[in-house]
A protein has these predicted regions:
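Expand to "…catalyze enediolate/carbanion chemistry for C-C bond making/breaking, isomerization
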Residues: 2-345
Length: 345
């Protein structure tokens, strides 16, 4: 596969990395693992951490872990549960600093204590905070303001990303406003609560496949979330599948979420779901091969226009292939040694 470069390729001692040149001051699209695994109990979180280490490729985890305060904490023991999670985040078992935390929603009395416990103890290492069940953008803004106040009080300079769980009609209606709020890097879809919020108008069959990909209101919601997220330069994350025994069902759900609806990430609620989700979310191998060849030639041309198989490529196509190559790397695909050296060393 030959590339005809319009100008001579300079011999560069210090080649320019794509992230430094392809975005021209605009926000760089978040590059996150394709799978987000939820666990609530200390036992299941410990198991998830071991699997995260076992499945890592070249020191990069192929899935994130979300420690769950909302559904994981026993009633009345929310603070103790948050303290346990903070301890895990600070522990040596957390090798990659890719543990996020879902706190309670803004109407629950425990959410402020949970957030304060996590940020005051583990704010330097928590990967992200998940905010569930907002009714509108104001709810999200309230919790983000509390997060920022805690960061300031605790002397935490780093940004702590926020993931927002869209699972009510009101939040769906304001998804674009939510996606524009500070620190938000993911919009998640909560299918079960979304269906329940429609008072029986959406049948229970839409909570699982194939109904979740067929019912008009559910598909509309998914398309709206993906469009709002991608339109604001953040990641759309697909809901769970309730199937835990048949890996083919999990894989097909993830494939449809990715290819039909534009989701770049998906929840897992059982360890057996992780690998099928990651596999289904991987880019096509042929496109990865093309990306490595094209990006190497573009870098040699100092990111100027090049010709490839009779077609002109410039920075717009470079951004596409660069983000594709990053997805390949984050899902554990085999990246040629030259591309690893150029872009990921």
């Amino acid at each position: 596969m030959m590339l005809n470069i319009f100008r001579d390729s300079p011999c560069m001692n210090n080649p320019i990395h794509p992230s430094a040149v392809l975005y021209a001051g605009s926000r760089i699209f978040p590059q996150l693992a394709a799978c987000e695994h939820f666990a609530g109990s200390e036992k299941m979180l410990g198991k998830a951490l071991r699997i995260q280490a076992e499945l890592s490729v070249d020191g990069v985890p192929i899935f994130d872990i979300t420690a769950d305060c909302e559904d994981g904490a026993p009633a009345g023991r929310e603070r103790e549960h948050a303290e346990m999670i903070a301890g895990l985040i600070l522990s040596g078992e957390n090798r990659f600093d890719r543990i996020g935390v879902r706190i309670h929603d803004v109407r629950h009395p425990a959410w402020r204590d949970e957030l304060e416990t996590i940020i005051s103890r583990a704010g330097q290492r928590v990967a992200y905070i998940v905010l569930p069940k907002p009714e509108n953008a104001k709810d999200v803004a309230t919790q983000i303001a509390a997060l920022d106040e805690l960061r300031s009080r605790c002397g935490i300079a780093r940004e702590i990303p926020v993931h927002v769980l869209i699972e009510t009609p009101g939040a769906l209606h304001e998804a674009w406003e939510i996606a524009r709020l500070p620190h938000v890097e993911v919009l998640d879809f909560g299918l079960m609560d979304f269906v329940s919020a429609h008072h029986g108008a959406i049948p229970a069959t839409a909570m699982r496949s194939p109904g979740q990909f067929d019912h008009a209101l559910v598909v509309r919601a998914k398309c709206g979330i993906a469009a709002a997220a991608l339109g604001n330069g953040i990641v759309p994350s697909h809901n769970v599948t309730t199937e835990i025994r048949d890996a083919n069902v999990v894989r097909e759900d993830a494939r449809r979420a990715r290819q039909e609806l534009g989701f770049l990430r998906m929840w897992s609620i059982h360890p057996a779901q992780i690998q099928p989700i990651v596999e289904a979310m991987r880019p096509d191998f042929a496109e990865v091969d093309e990306a490595t060849t094209l990006l190497a030639a573009a870098q040699d041309a100092v990111w100027g226009p090049i010709q490839h198989e009779g077609k002109l490529h410039d920075r717009a196509s470079y951004r596409y292939y660069w983000e594709l190559l990053q997805r390949a790397q984050s899902t554990g695909m085999n990246i040629p040694a030259d591309a690893r050296q150029r872009f990921f060393s």
